[in-house]
Curated annotation (Swiss-Prot):
SUPFAM superfamilies: Family A G protein-coupled receptor-like (SSF81321). The keyword tRNA-binding does not apply. It comes from the Eukaryota. The chain crosses the membrane at residues 92-112, 123-143, 164-184, 203-223, 263-283, 318-338, 356-376. This is Neuropeptide F receptor. The lineage of its organism: Eukaryota, Metazoa, Ecdysozoa, Arthropoda, Hexapoda. One of its GO terms (biological process) is neuropeptide signaling pathway. One of its GO terms (molecular function) is neuropeptide Y receptor activity. Expressed in midgut, brain lobes and ventral nerve cord of larvae. In adults, expressed in a pair of dorsolateral neurons in the protocerebrum, and the central complex and a small number of neurons in the subesophageal ganglion (at protein level). Expressed in a subset of sugar-responsive PAIN neurons in the thoracic body but is absent from other peripheral PAIN neurons.
Amino acid sequence: MIISMNQTEPAQLADGEHLSGYASSSNSVRYLDDRHPLDYLDLGTVHALNTTAINTSDLNETGSRPLDPVLIDRFLSNRAVDSPWYHMLISMYGVLIVFGALGNTLVVIAVIRKPIMRTARNLFILNLAISDLLLCLVTMPLTLMEILSKYWPYGSCSILCKTIAMLQALCIFVSTISITAIAFDRYQVIVYPTRDSLQFVGAVTILAGIWALALLLASPLFVYKELINTDTPALLQQIGLQDTIPYCIEDWPSRNGRFYYSIFSLCVQYLVPILIVSVAYFGIYNKLKSRITVVAVQASSAQRKVERGRRMKRTNCLLISIAIIFGVSWLPLNFFNLYADMERSPVTQSMLVRYAICHMIGMSSACSNPLLYGWLNDNFRKEFQELLCRCSDTNVALNGHTTGCNVQAAARRRRKLGAELSKGELKLLGPGGAQSGTAGGEGGLAATDFMTGHHEGGLRSAITESVALTDHNPVPSEVTKLMPR
């Protein structure tokens, strides 16, 4: 924010209001600005508005003119928006927070509760869920409070001003970089399946690098955020307002420093990730399409052709959905802030509302990610169903009716029995018999579990026709080495 000294024009306030600041005899700037909400409010990688310079002029102890009652009420209640929008924004943010927190919590529990889910690639999804959970529980509530407040609502601790801004940026950077890492990892696994697969230690190292990079990208906010206290004119003090008003501002060393950082954030947090995600998933689409074509020629069953075509269509829809949802979610907020930084228009209530809507669209990614990376993954969906329907295998429904829990319990018993039978059958097959079940070379990669990066060759297809193997009952070690990775 720019503070201009010794100017005579009145300061521009929200909703067209004006209030003059004043300079003391010692030439230190004292001013009161009705609201610089988006200057003092940083929502992570994206910044909001740089308002015009705060102008100061002489103001006597009683004020140069009477203040509007609405303006006085906003100061006394520390509200930047009127009641209708105030309650609507709280409700809309509340819905996002609840659904986002619930979905991401399910993902975290699903990975932690069972060892079989703690794979190297699931760590990326776990990391994304943790960052999105922080978006829901930290970034959104803090941002909502700052949007609704006319001045800094969190007391006089300057470290809190710096930390909150950096934490908001950190969560968004981690979320978008994690999405990019997931896309790149899937590209490597599916397009280059013969390369060494990612190990657990390697995945942990990459995740540590993601957090370190995000922390580095967010660190300028910790450096340049400052908490300042402005003296309140006597007129407002007489009606009960505190002696000083706190603002958490960005104090960049140059006038355009904030604009440059906004450009940098736009590139790192939006343009580069959307480019990588789009290119990676387009490459995956082409690879899967070529595999399906090869296997379709070799397939002897019309039903198998239909099933592979259905799976390919589902995968294509998922690929397109991930890229589009990511782009659409973050586009409004990034370009709103870029436009606002260039225009430096006075902040009004309508601008605050537009900003809040763009911000909620961006934060909606925290709600969609558990669906795209969790529910659409067969492994995670089964875990979600078990978490949401915790019942024992012997649970008996009331009134003698069968419930969904009973059905799931029976299904789990069948899967367990199938796994035991499959182990016996595979031992009878032996290495030679197992090898004969493959579809042969690249053609054997008939279908790909896109969400996990595991391939299904002719061997697994042959097995699953007789015995239902699930992700909780993986292929035994006797034949794992024969399957392409």
